[in-house]
């Protein structure tokens, strides 16, 4: 974002507050957790109406969530609240006739599907099922619904699964029994239940016995832990469901071979549509007329950060091709135009998440909108509706024409709260990193920046490692919170980061401690030379996951660069890490195989092998429910420092996983982190 654009946004926010309002204060964690959160947006099929959810947090920290309706045909329209029940309505969809909406809510103790007429009245339960519905999708004609519920594959009906869950809860024994991996995933021990798909007719009758179209298959769809209903769809004729899943096998922990499967809506034989590809296939998406199936496909088995290719299958001729094979970006979503000739996609791009138009016949790619981080909601009537956030915008809905013109803000869910918040000015920069290649990053000035002063640095290192600290607004690692606390913030997208071409992403493979370390050193030297208000001699570095690994790597390989370090969920010993993490495909690809077959590379970049160089004060943070990087990694680093007299503190959250999600815990996290940094930077 250009500097002038940022300043304009800040001025506009300031003008919005009333004359009696308090002066804006530097952003703090209390303000972060109290921001309203927009979610669950949907656009009607005729493009005239928008429904979205807003979670509102009051000054006492109490939260409520409701749905709002906005008339898109009237530029002066104000949103109308259409729900007021306790709890949260989410996963909104419009009916085929646009007269009602569907959503999920837990109004009777379990998550069920509801329908609400938009001309008034109360929401009516569409389902009465003994298990939670975790997601759903409507057929194109609106006459069917596919739902995902967690069941036991051997059970013939939902009551059987309900009884099994109850028996587990009431069992007097606590032992968990396993015969193959995975035994736990992300933050949950496996209980042998699976996400399955159920289809039912929407005919005005309450759904009580949907058809399990994935019956007897010991597989997960949508895949855990983060996939949703973007991995499931009806064929446009309503005769089949297509979904992404792994085949049942004993190699679940070390394969990324997700395929697209097609099954009749009545159940029966399942057809593997992508059997030839042994890498990841994802997000089946049909053109409205059913002729084309588009989906995303990787080509490298076992590599979760491979570039997603856009594949297009002609269901009439049976021919398939890659669309835009020379486009060096990895799409994260697919949406067909009404005529099926264009795909609208989002992809990380130079620190942004941008929206692109892709011609399906010729493969031409054209950027439509490339400021901030954007997720596409719908394409209708030559308008793209999307959610946008940035380093100074928590998230609202916008529209833009398919030509990328007439950007219009549709919601302003934090108008009053943002009027009282002062953000730091930010700018993207670049420098010559490893191999003299261009590397990008961001700096942010302290919110109360004064010309001529120098400020301590918060050097944020992202995780992944195939990830990015870009132009987005995070609910966890929010760079503006350090700016609000008086720090100059620096973030570098080192070699291995995403959004800069696949070769750049791939370059970190088998070189975890090499190119990234060189980039981070050169990035610090470059930005402090360019921006003299940054105090190069008074900096603390922070990182989570791979970023936490890098804090441990700094200790052994760059131990004179920082006054302090903060290591959140960082890897300490690559040998033990390999044997206790859950998704084995990740370390096996990153380090060229299993530990026993490739010890040399695992040990080359193993922080524990360099502990004799450790001396920088470090705060270690870990969640006990972190099964990606189990908490023993953090405990081991802390133990070494304590035993060897290195200033160190440990913060453990028994109820958190790899991320800090509880809002009270998040406030404790920031209190400890900023307190630790203030201590060592003498701020």
What are these regions (language model features)?
Residues 47-50, 98-101, 145, 241, ...:
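Hydrophobic beta-strand positions that form the internal "hydrophobic ladder"
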């Amino acid at each position: 974002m250009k500097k002038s654009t940022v300043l304009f946004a800040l001025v506009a926010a300031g003008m919005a507050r009333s004359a009696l309002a308090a002066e804006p204060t530097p952003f703090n964690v209390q303000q972060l957790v109290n921001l309203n959160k927009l979610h669950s947006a949907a656009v009607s099929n005729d493009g005239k109406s928008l429904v979205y959810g807003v979670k509102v947090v009051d000054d006492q920290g109490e939260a409520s969530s409701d749905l709002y309706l906005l008339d898109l045909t009237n530029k002066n329209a104000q949103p109308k609240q259409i729900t007021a029940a306790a709890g949260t309505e989410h996963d909104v969809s419009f009916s085929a006739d646009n007269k009602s909406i569907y959503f999920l809510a837990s109004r009777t103790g379990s998550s069920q599907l509801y329908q609400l007429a938009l001309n008034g009245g109360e929401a009516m339960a569409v389902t009465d099922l003994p298990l939670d519905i975790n997601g759903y999708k409507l057929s194109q004609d609106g006459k069917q619904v596919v739902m995902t519920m967690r069941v036991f594959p051997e059970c013939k009906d939902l009551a059987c699964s309900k009884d099994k869950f109850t028996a587990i809860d009431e069992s007097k024994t606590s032992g968990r029994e396993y015969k193959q991996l995975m035994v736990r995933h992300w933050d949950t021990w496996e209980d042998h239940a699976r996400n399955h798909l159920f289809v039912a007719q929407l005919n005005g009758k309450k759904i009580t016995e949907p058809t399990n179209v994935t019956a007897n298959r010991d597989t997960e769809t949508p895949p855990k832990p983060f996939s949703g209903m973007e991995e499931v769809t009806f064929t446009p004729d309503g005769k089949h469901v297509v979904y992404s899943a792994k085949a049942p096998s004993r190699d679940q922990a070390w394969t990324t071979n997700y395929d697209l499967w097609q099954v009749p809506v009545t159940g029966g034989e399942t057809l593997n549509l992508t059997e030839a590809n042994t890498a990841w296939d994802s997000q089946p998406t049909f053109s409205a007329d059913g002729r084309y199936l588009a989906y995303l496909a990787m080509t490298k088995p076992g590599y979760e950060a491979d570039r997603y290719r856009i594949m297009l299958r002609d269901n009439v001729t049976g021919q398939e091709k890659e669309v835009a094979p020379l486009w060096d970006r990895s799409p994260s979503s697919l949406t067909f135009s009404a005529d099926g000739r264009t795909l609208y996609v989002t992809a990380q791009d130079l620190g942004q998440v941008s929206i692109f138009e892709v011609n399906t016949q010729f493969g031409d790619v054209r950027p439509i909108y490339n400021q901030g981080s954007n997720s596409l909601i719908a394409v209708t009537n030559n308008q793209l509706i999307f959610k946008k956030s940035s380093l100074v915008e928590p998230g609202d809905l916008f529209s833009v024409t398919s030509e990328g013109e007439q950007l219009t803000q549709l919601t302003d869910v934090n108008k009053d709260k943002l009027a009282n918040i002062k953000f730091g000015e930010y700018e993207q920069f670049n420098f010559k990193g490893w191999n003299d290649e261009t590397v990008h990053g961001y700096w942010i000035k302290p919110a109360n920046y004064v010309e001529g002063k120098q400020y301590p640095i918060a050097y944020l290192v992202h995780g992944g490692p195939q990830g990015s600290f870009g132009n987005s607004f995070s609910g966890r690692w929010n760079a503006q919170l350090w700016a609000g606390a008086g720090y100059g913030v620096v973030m570098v997208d080192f070699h291995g980061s995403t959004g800069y071409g696949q070769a750049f992403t791939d370059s970190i493979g088998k070189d975890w401690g090499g190119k990234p370390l060189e980039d981070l050193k050169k990035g610090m030297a470059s930005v402090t030379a360019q921006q003299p208000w940054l105090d190069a001699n008074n900096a603390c570095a922070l990182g989570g996951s791979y970023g936490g690994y890098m804090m441990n790597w700094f200790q052994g390989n760059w131990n004179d660069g920082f006054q302090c370090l903060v290591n959140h969920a960082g890897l300490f010993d690559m040998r033990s890490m390999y044997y206790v993490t859950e998704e084995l495909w990740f370390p096996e690809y990153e380090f060229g195989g299993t530990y026993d077959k490739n010890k040399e590379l695992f040990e080359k970049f193993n922080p524990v092998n360099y502990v004799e160089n450790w001396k920088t004060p470090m705060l270690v943070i870990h969640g006990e429910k972190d099964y990606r990087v189990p908490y023993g990694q953090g405990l081991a680093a802390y133990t070494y420092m304590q035993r060897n007299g290195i200033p160190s503190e440990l913060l453990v959250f028994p109820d958190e996983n790899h991320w800090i999600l509880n809002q009270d815990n998040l406030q404790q996290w920031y209190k400890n982190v900023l307190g630790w940094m203030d201590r060592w930077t003498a701020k």
